[in-house]
Each structure stands twice: as C-alpha cells, then as structure tokens.
C-alpha cells in the first residue's frame, strides 16, 4: 500500500481531518519515516508524458463542461496543469510507472466512473479504464485479500 504526499495532504483538510484523527499514526514522524510514507510525487513524471498530455486533452476532458465554461486556451491550460499536479493524477501517474516496471497495481478509490460533478476532467475510474489500470473500492480490496483486516472503533 502506497500513500502519496498529495493524498496525505488532502486528508488534513477533507472532512475536517477525520482520516488523520482516526488513523493518528499517519501523523507520527517515526511511523512515517519507517514506512517511507508519504511517497513523494514532486518529481514524478509519466512514462510517456507527451502521450498522457494528448490523452488528457482529448480523452480525459469533459468537453461538454469545457464548452459550458467557455474556457479560453490559457484558462484550459491552467486547469490542465492544476489537474496534472493534484492527488488524482499523481496516483495515476505513479500507477503507470509501477506498471511499466512490472508491478501488479490496483488503485483504491471511492470514486465511481460515472458521476463527474460537472468537473472539467473525468474521474479516476474512467481515466484508469482508458489506461488499463485496475481500480477497486476499499471494501472490494478487503474482500479480495484475506490478510487485510480493518477494525472500526
């Protein structure tokens, strides 16, 4: 299980930091150092950057939303760059790199492929489907692997 820096960062402000409150070890410096968490993504590059950019502009964009928002080319480029640097795309880029290196990868997400909430870019499962990256929800992952046990208090 890999936790990237962008996801850990989002955990601090999503749901008032509930994840970090319940999983307090994710704030403990000794644990973070020993577990090599979080995975740093600041210099993470896609295996084929030009191809990914083309896919982002052509396949992963919600063109209906793009037209509705009447974005200029500059505005679109700014939003595309923001999306490339957010947690969703960093997870996807990491998965692409791991797959390239022969790793078996599953991206765990609670997002669904369909609901897009009027966002400019598609959700993780839709992008992963195009890129042939397997996705699962946390309950699906727990059901698949017998050794995983979760205790809710």
Predicted segment positions?
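Acidic, metal-binding active-site segment of PIN/NYN-like and related structure-specific nucleases
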Residues: 86-150
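Active-site-proximal, substrate-binding regions of enzyme catalytic domains
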Residues: 1-105, 113-114
């Amino acid at each position: 299980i890999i936790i990237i820096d962008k996801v850990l960062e989002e955990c601090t402000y999503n749901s008032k930091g509930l994840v970090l409150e319940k999983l307090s070890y994710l704030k403990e410096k000794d644990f973070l150092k020993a577990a090599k968490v979080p995975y740093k993504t600041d210099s993470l590059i896609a295996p084929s950057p030009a191809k990914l950019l083309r896919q982002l502009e052509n396949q992963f964009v919600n063109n209906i939303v793009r037209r509705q928002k009447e974005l200029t080319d500059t505005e679109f480029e700014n939003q595309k760059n923001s999306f490339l640097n957010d947690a969703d795309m960093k997870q996807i880029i990491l998965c692409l790199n791991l797959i390239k290196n022969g790793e078996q990868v599953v991206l765990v997400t609670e997002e669904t492929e369909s609901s897009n909430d009027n966002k400019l870019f598609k959700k993780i499962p839709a992008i992963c489907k195009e890129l042939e990256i397997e996705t699962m929800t946390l309950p699906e992952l727990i059901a698949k692997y017998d050794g995983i046990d979760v205790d809710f208090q």
